[in-house]
Amino acid sequence: MLDIQLLRSNTAAVAERLARRGYDFDTARFDALEERRKSVQVKTEELQASRNSISKQIGALKGQGKHEEAQAAMDQVAQIKTDLEQAAADLDAVQKELDAWLLSIPNLPHESVPPGKDETENVEVRKVGTPREFDFEIKDHVDLGEPLGLDFEGGAKLSGARFTVMRGQIARLHRALAQFMLDTHMLQHGYTEHYTPYIVDDTTLQGTGQLPKFAEDLFHVTRGGDETKTTQYLIPTAEVTLTNTVAGSIIPSEQLPLKLTAHSPCFRSEAGSYGKDTRGLIRQHQFDKVEMVQIVHPEKSYGALEEMVGHAENILKALELPYRVITLCTGDMGFSAAKTYDLEVWVPAQNTYREISSCSNCEDFQARRMKARFKDENGKNRLVHTLNGSGLAVGRTLVAVLENHQNADGSINIPAALQPYMGGVTKLEVK
């Protein structure tokens, strides 16, 4: 959520920054709401002053034996009380309308974010590794994976399109990837592993920015026997739960940064992705991801963003996968982000790079929604900055390992870093 004081003092500048990311901020509507709010507040203050003045007169009038005048004054106070209740209701209505609107407004882009309308204007930062040249006809991950235990028909039979069953060697490799990622982030990068719920309420999703704007992208669930039919949601990412662990908290500054990680399934309806990536694991309704979250001092958040990108890169380097880092332009950033780097891994069968990690600094945007603060060195409570990043998407990493490390006979070489997690197995072979 944006800072309302910043909006009030720099409305035009905020509107201009939002326009950079394609959001049309209605300044006329904001000004009208502000006028309503100010008008009600002025009226409230006038009524309170009048009530206080008249209340002081009542005692004096009674002392002077002017009972009729005292009663008239008491009647005035009673009417003012009614008027104040109405003014409070009017102010509450304006505030609720303003708050609801603020919840739908995206974050302001950082000044270093390149301008652009969509993904075609993202800026490449660096490429790492050289895509392998194959001396045989390459297969995609579907053709490689199905003989090794990747079962798309089984997933469709159980749950419909965009679900997958894994068994045997593929299931083991998928698990090994997640364990390797978690261990790397814990043991090398200093994150604390978490296990968090996969079902959350709307307040939690509002805190990280998925609600109210992106309800159609979520899977809704209701509890059996719940007569009120309270709606809960399957998490679209562990960013939601990890970040919200500090909701409503005041963290001592010496405890910052907090570095949190979790391996979880992610559930997404992919409402706007009909017809995209219909083959294989690239776009699923359910997929696993290892998430990184950092809760940091505001002055250190952009250093933390670079660090987090490096943590995701270390996984790709260890798995011997070519990749590139891009900076998302203003028109392609996520709702809560002030700046985002995407890591894209080389997918040989598609002859292109595909997103495998997204690392974002949300500055105080999520913290304001969650009321997540820290106590600074002067004893003042301030909003923290929150960052999140994929470290990595497990299914897409599986795709990259299968395709980049394939052999002509359909076998898959296991990267050395993964072999301890595979019981020493060095190659997946069709049996």
Curated annotation (Swiss-Prot):
Q: Which Pfam families match?
A: Seryl_tRNA_N (PF02403), tRNA-synt_2b (PF00587)
Q: Show the PROSITE patterns listed in the entry.
A: AA_TRNA_LIGASE_II
EC primary class: ligase
GO MF annotation terms: ATP binding; serine-tRNA ligase activity
In the UniProt record, which is one GO cellular component term?
cytoplasm
The protein's UniProt keywords, in alphabetical order, are:
Aminoacyl-tRNA synthetase, ATP-binding, Cytoplasm, Ligase, Nucleotide-binding, Protein biosynthesis
- GO BP term, example: seryl-tRNA aminoacylation
Q: Its Enzyme Commission number?
A: 6.1.1.11
Compartments where located: Cytoplasm
Domain of life, per UniProt, equals Bacteria
Q: Which pathway?
A: Aminoacyl-tRNA biosynthesis; selenocysteinyl-tRNA(Sec) biosynthesis; L-seryl-tRNA(Sec) from L-serine and tRNA(Sec): step 1/1
Which residues of this UniProt protein bind L-serine?
A: 237-239, 291, 390
The record lists the catalysed reaction(s) as: tRNA(Ser) + L-serine + ATP = L-seryl-tRNA(Ser) + AMP + diphosphate + H(+); tRNA(Sec) + L-serine + ATP = L-seryl-tRNA(Sec) + AMP + diphosphate + H(+)
Q: Which residues bind ATP?
A: 268-270, 355-358
Record HAMAP family: Ser_tRNA_synth_type1 (MF_00176)
The UniProt entry, under PANTHER family, shows:
SERINE--TRNA LIGASE, SERYL-TRNA SYNTHETASE
NCBIfam families linked to this entry: serS
Task: Give the quaternary structure.
Answer: Homodimer. The tRNA molecule binds across the dimer.
Q: Which family does it belong to?
A: Belongs to the class-II aminoacyl-tRNA synthetase family. Type-1 seryl-tRNA synthetase subfamily.
Q: What does this protein do?
A: Catalyzes the attachment of serine to tRNA(Ser). Is also able to aminoacylate tRNA(Sec) with serine, to form the misacylated tRNA L-seryl-tRNA(Sec), which will be further converted into selenocysteinyl-tRNA(Sec).
Question: What is the name attached to this protein's record?
Answer: Serine--tRNA ligase
Please name the source species.
Answer: Neisseria gonorrhoeae (strain ATCC 700825 / FA 1090)
Gene name in the database record: serS
